[in-house]
């Protein structure tokens, strides 16, 4: 999966001051001591030094602050989401998965520091992510803590991103192409939108709208990534075709994939508008990301027409 296919590294969704605060939190998310084994330390530092677009973390921060969380708590939860995302990329790039050559403009971590160091670094980010979430739950009622735990299990557990990745690695499995695509990207985006809302005690109607937005955006993002495979990406990330797998665009064809993309973007526009009516402070981040997905869709259409 290409982490930058739909958003560039410079695509800030937040205001400059808030973005600077979030970046500062993410830079110190894991303290790499001088006594840590050099290969593992190097693997973790390489990830921290190339943070990518951070759009999931930005969404988590925006939703957290809009629903009443302190900036400190919102920053911790955003850092947790980004930690889980970083772990997923480290694992996704391994030879047993996508066998990627590069990530975020650099050689993939496992190609620089070895597979073992990449796996251990991934585990470090997973554990740090859970630690950051726990720090945000200390003052929550028991029922809310249970809701957060269920969401974490749903998105990060066996039936979440792990099942999505396993199905992606199993050519010939008779899965619905859209469900297969959604299983790769929706869980982490769902967590980014719902985790801060749950910690903030947001009402059920807002959580339902955030869920709908996560599902629409998650599938749209994956379709854009799949369509990128059809126009011969050269970023070094292992494409599905190179890995012997048919993604959604490969299974149903580019025209059908674009039609489904348009449907999901329309669904996302409706969901985002409903959320903004309830929380006007979210207008900037949500509409900026929606516009960027739409712009990416139009760039693909222009490339196909050329």
What are these regions (language model features)?
Residues 1, 291-305:
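Terminal targeting/low-complexity segments that flank the catalytic cores of oxidoreductases
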Residues 30-270, 279-294:
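Mg2+-dependent prenyl diphosphate-binding active-site environment of isoprenoid biosynthetic enzymes
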